[in-house]
Amino acid sequence: MESENILEAKQVSVAFRIAGKFQKAIYDIDLSLRRGEVLAIVGESGSGKSTLATAVMGLHNPNQTQITGSILLDEEEVIGKTGDSMASIRGSKVGMIFQNPLTALNPLMKIGQQIKEMLAVHDVYPENQYESRIFQLLEQVGIPNPKRVVNQFPHQLSGGMRQRVMIAIAIANDPDLIIADEPTTALDVTIQAQILDLILEIQKKKNAGVILITHDLGVVAEVADTVAVMYAGQLVEKASVEELFQNPKHPYTRSLLRSNPSAETVSDDLYVIPGSVPSLSEIEYDKDLFLARVPWMKEEAQKVISEKMTEISSNHFVRGQAWKKFEFPDQKLKGGKK
């Protein structure tokens, strides 16, 4: 019987070798993704979002990285797999759309060759169908005149066209999971919308699971089913998109949402989250990492110990108890939300 979950990650930690010793970049991550679900992972730069994605893809250097825990992809364990054993999974069961297609694509290979290479690694399609499959993929992602594009190099295409090629490569072998790592960051607004619509169209057609890594909360509200918030390598909150936007609990989640401008913003000054994400050498995972960054909560931060994620309501998980103590300064003065 086919499992409902395409991805199950349990107690996943990733550590990088830095100056001769391993330092954890992400710690104790538990996540699952159902077929047909869109999971958005949000957080500032340095929160560990892409590190988690590359762990799922098996893209870390095993000599410089330690990965512990369990990552089941379609019920198959991927932690510990390297070389050909991981290559057989990457591209067939999971495909990844990278942030910058200009650096992700090979500048010395024509577009058609790059898609053919992805098909040749796996046995999903026979060799005599490669050419027709390449044209089919390029048409599917909305590229006009595929016969011309297959003979072009990446630099000859626009940014939007290159990202469409990246999507074609990612879905070439019909993976059950698509990871989109900031797929629209380098594109203008109108092209961003087209690319997001394309990803969702493919997801619905194939009933694939999608992990969308982004810092754009507007995009999250529009396309996600579930949201996972990461901070300094930890998952701090996870809930349905409706629940998270209407009833955020963790101080970091609330700060992210408050700093996001909207049409309803009436204050002259936008809220700015104080400080910055700590470096790997500064992280103490037994402390509440975000409270230590907030000036008016530093004293409280010393008393709050970081705890595991707990379910505070149906499918709404929050790390620790800090959310019960956190208030914005103006809330203390006015006794309520601004």
From Swiss-Prot:
Keyword Transport belongs to the record: yes
Binding-site residues for ATP, renumbered to this chain: 43-50
Membrane topology: Peripheral membrane protein
Gene Ontology CC entries for this record: plasma membrane
Biological process per Gene Ontology, one example term: protein transport
Gene name in the database record: oppD
EC number(s) given by UniProt: 7.4.2.6
Top-level taxon of origin: Bacteria
Family of the protein in this entry: Belongs to the ABC transporter superfamily.
Subunit details: The complex is composed of two ATP-binding proteins (OppD and OppF), two transmembrane proteins (OppB and OppC) and a solute-binding protein (OppA).
Record domain ABC transporter: where: 7-257
Keywords: ATP-binding, Cell membrane, Membrane, Nucleotide-binding, Peptide transport, Plasmid, Protein transport, Translocase, Transport
Catalytic activity as recorded in UniProt: a [peptide](out) + ATP + H2O = a [peptide](in) + ADP + phosphate + H(+)
This protein's name: Oligopeptide transport ATP-binding protein OppD
Gene3D superfamilies associated with the record: P-loop containing nucleotide triphosphate hydrolases
A GO MF label: ATP binding
Cell compartments where the protein resides: Cell membrane
Function: Part of the ABC transporter complex OppABCDF involved in the uptake of oligopeptides. Probably responsible for energy coupling to the transport system. Essential for uptake of peptides larger than three amino acids and for growth in milk.
